[in-house]
């Protein structure tokens, strides 16, 4: 899985990339949960974080520094403020993340269907990130930046992968990236 699988079984965990998303670009990646009991207290958050590395003493780069989708509720979380947004995420769903650093928006795609955009920071660093809330349920989450639409051969997906690439023909995605958004990987 190349450090793209996060297994958590403890209170408040997180994972983020070592690379930021530069201003002036449009980026796409996918996330799936292959194991998770799910409850409001265990909410998986998917999105981008403003920290340059997680604060592992204080909620692993928590929602107060992130723009994310709160998976259990389907709410958007803008720097710790929640509001209505989309559909709750369940095990086996594929969530596409489209970050637009030109127009400063983020949009989440639930099994290929967009949930609408909301604004993100127009300056500073943003890092792809996932975080698991305060419960103790086991969670297995995989990230696909264009390297493998099967998420390392995970079972439980619906099997309808598009094996899609971005507009430059780069990447292997489960769902088709939105036009103009590029893989966060090289060919």
List the predicted regions and their residue ranges:
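PRY/SPRY (B30.2) beta-sandwich protein-interaction domains
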Residues: 1-187
């Amino acid at each position: 899985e190349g450090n793209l699988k996060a297994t958590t079984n403890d209170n408040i965990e997180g994972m983020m990339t070592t690379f930021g998303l530069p201003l002036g670009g449009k980026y796409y990646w996918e996330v799936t949960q292959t194991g998770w009991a799910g409850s409001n207290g265990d909410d998986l958050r998917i999105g981008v974080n403003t920290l340059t590395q997680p604060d592992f003493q204080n909620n692993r780069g928590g929602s107060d520094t992130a723009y994310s989708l709160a998976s259990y509720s389907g709410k958007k979380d803008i720097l710790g403020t929640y509001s209505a947004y989309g559909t709750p995420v369940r095990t086996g769903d594929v969530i596409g993340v489209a970050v637009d650093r030109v127009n400063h928006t983020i949009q989440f795609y639930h099994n290929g269907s967009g949930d609408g955009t909301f604004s993100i920071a127009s300056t500073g660093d943003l890092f792809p990130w996932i975080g698991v809330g305060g419960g103790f349920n086991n969670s297995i989450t995989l990230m696909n930046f264009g390297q493998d639409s099967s998420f390392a051969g995970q079972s439980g997906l619906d099997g309808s992968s598009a094996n899609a690439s971005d507009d430059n023909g780069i990447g292997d995605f489960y769902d088709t990236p939105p036009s103009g958004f590029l893989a966060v990987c090289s060919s």
